[in-house]
């Protein structure tokens, strides 16, 4: 059962209690706007070896956002739960919940995506221009980004606060079945991140498969095949942004940036805040890479 419950106009965390866990399940998680759909496609390619989506029309049918309710992809919650129950092995399910709002299963593999809050906010702001307002009229964004920023930083508008979500997953980063992935690493060194995901999932990957994963998870491929990946509730071809970080530097005044620097440390603590802002690899992961390098160097040719 969930330790905490999250219920709002988009989500009901208790829906997860109706999903029977499997030993092979994978859960892809983020707060939002942190590379979730990209990671769904990477995991799809690692597990299934192609972009056919096992015959489904979109990644959101093959990898449903479980707690999303009502979900435009499905006619009813009952149909959605039946769909999830009948998904083929290995299932990879999506969530935007904090860790403690999920029913934890030690056999499930969890991948959590993190991104600098300034990039998250700008991506969310830009997404506001792509919503289908017949579904989400109240999410239409009309103010400037600096105006949007002030409200979002404190409240998480239009969705929910980023900080509690990140912190809940940060606290379990040492669990062997939990992998934290920073978006800056994912777009800056995708081959390495793909290898880390493959290792977590127990997927053996030769050069040909790795090339396939990298090619068919590229922004170019996913934009060209947008029908497979566009999230429900967006206008056609309006879901994907530029996929770049740091564009907020030209939009936020210095005083707001300085306030963010203090705010994020207060919310997350120094170590977590530094990682969220800068990316890079966490100490435990760095040590493992070092151990692997030493072992390789000591292995006779």
Language-model features and meaning:
Residues 215-236:
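Short acidic/His-enriched helical or mixed secondary-structure segments at domain edges of catalytic enzymes
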Residues 47-49, 190-205:
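Non-catalytic, well-ordered alpha-helical segments in soluble enzyme domains
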């Amino acid at each position: 059962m969930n330790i905490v419950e999250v219920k709002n106009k988009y989500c009901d965390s208790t829906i997860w209690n109706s999903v029977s866990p499997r030993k092979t399940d994978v859960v892809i998680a983020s707060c939002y706007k942190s590379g979730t759909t990209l990671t769904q496609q990477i995991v799809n390619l690692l597990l299934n070896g192609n972009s056919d989506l096992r015959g489904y029309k979109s990644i959101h049918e093959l990898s449903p956002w479980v707690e999303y309710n009502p979900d435009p992809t499905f006619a009813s919650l009952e149909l959605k739960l039946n769909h999830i129950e009948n998904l083929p092995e290995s299932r990879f399910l999506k969530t935007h919940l904090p860790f403690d709002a999920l029913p934890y299963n030690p056999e499930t593999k969890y991948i959590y995506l993190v991104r600098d809050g300034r990039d998250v906010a700008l991506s969310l702001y830009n997404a506001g221009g792509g919503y289908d307002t017949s579904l989400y009229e109240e999410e239409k964004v009309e103010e400037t980004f600096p105006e949007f920023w002030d409200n979002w930083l404190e409240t998480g508008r239009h969705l929910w606060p980023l900080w509690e979500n990140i912190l809940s997953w940060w606290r379990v980063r040492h669990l062997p079945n939990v992998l934290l992935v920073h978006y800056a690493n994912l777009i800056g060194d995708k081959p390495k991140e793909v290898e880390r995901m493959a290792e977590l999932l127990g997927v053996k990957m030769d050069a040909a498969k790795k090339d396939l994963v990298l090619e068919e998870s590229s922004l170019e491929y996913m934009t060209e095949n947008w029908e497979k990946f566009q999230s429900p509730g967006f206008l056609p071809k309006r879901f994907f942004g530029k996929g770049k970080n740091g564009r907020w530097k030209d939009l936020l005044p210095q005083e707001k940036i300085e306030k963010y620097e203090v705010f994020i440390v207060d919310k997350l603590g120094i170590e977590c805040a530094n990682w969220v802002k800068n990316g890079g690899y966490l100490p435990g992961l760095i040590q493992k890479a070092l151990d692997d390098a030493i072992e390789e160097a000591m292995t006779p040719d």
